[in-house]
A protein has these predicted regions:
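Gly/serine-rich nucleotide phosphate-binding loop at the start of the catalytic core
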Residues: 1-68, 74
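Active-site-proximal, Lys/Arg-enriched surface segment
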Residues: 36, 67-146, 242-255
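Short, conserved acidic/polar surface loops in the N-terminal third of protein domains
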Residues: 111-118, 149-150, 197-199, 217-218
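Electropositive, glycine- and tryptophan-enriched low-complexity nucleic-acid-binding patches
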Residues: 59-65, 124-183
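An internal, acidic/charged active-site-proximal segment
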Residues: 156-255
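Generic alpha-helix structural propensity
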Residues: 41-45, 58, 62, 72-80, ...
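A generic secondary-structure signal
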Residues: 52, 84-88, 172-179
Length: 255
């Protein structure tokens, strides 16, 4: 076993340390199969991945029982891992103008042939929704040296077999809003709308949107004469061209 493999096993041992005896060993073997890439060949199938990793039938059954009936919680493992990273002191959070970014996004394990599961998530490679088990991920953005490395903070799993991507997105945003600290800003990809972020009451955020996006102020313009305004003034973050004419961006309120 190489030095890197030994160090990986030592970290896994520390992560599962709070878990009851027996279950901790089974979870360690399961996580080792995940890290080794054995789940890729079996498309996420647990028994196939464990068999590919060289575990015996008895060990495979023990891992399966620990996964679905063991006395453990994913947040215990995440907390233990974060404490290990903090004690190691190599990972450092990214800070921009005294703000710490926290990434919030969705991902999925694609299982097109999984029986009894109807939930679908958008697959960017296929450019359409495909059957898969969706997850919401919340992670601190940091780096080890010059390499950017996210530090997992929370996982939001789909609750039901038919849960929609929109519902999972909403629960993930609500979770992120509760976990966001005073000096943190949530970072979102283009898959989430500004309305969803506001409904989750996230106080500070940066969200990727279309280059031609526009919005409206939440206050009505000052009444001068004529018909009264029903909507706020249009705000255009970026200038754009239309029919050969340049539409200027809205002036900033402050810098």
């Amino acid at each position: 076993m190489t030095t890197a493999s030994q160090r990986t096993v030592q970290v896994l041992e520390q992560i599962v340390k709070p878990v009851p005896l027996g279950t901790n060993l089974a979870l360690l073997q399961l996580m080792w199969a995940i890290i080794s890439g054995a789940f890729l060949t079996g498309r996420g199938a647990i028994h196939t991945a464990l068999k590919e990793s060289g575990f015996r039938s008895q060990e495979i059954r023990r891992c399966w029982c620990a996964l679905w009936a063991g006395q453990w919680h994913i947040y215990e493992l995440i907390k233990q891992f974060r404490e290990l990273v903090s004690a190691d002191a190599q990972w450092q959070p990214r800070i921009c103008a005294d703000w710490r970014p926290v990434s919030v996004d969705l991902t999925a394990i694609w299982r097109p042939r999984l029986q009894g599961w109807s939930g679908k998530m958008f697959n960017r490679l296929a450019d359409k929704k495909k059957t898969g088990i969706g997850y919401g991920l919340i992670a601190d953005i940091g780096a080890i040296g010059e390499q950017r490395v996210p530090l997992l903070r929370a996982i939001v799993r789909g609750e039901t077999a038919g849960e929609s991507e929109t519902t999972l997105q909403r629960r993930t945003l609500n979770k992120a809003a509760k976990m966001l600290k005073e000096d943190e800003v949530s970072i979102h990809d283009a898959g989430v709308s500004l309305r969803e972020i506001h409904e989750a009451r996230i106080p500070r955020f940066v969200a990727r949107q279309r280059s031609n996006i526009t919005g409206r102020r939440n206050t009505l313009p000052l009444y001068r004469s004529g018909r009264r305004h029903k909507f706020g003034e249009i705000v255009r973050p970026l200038a754009r061209k239309r029919a050969g004419k340049v539409i200027a961006a809205s002036p900033t309120d402050c810098v």
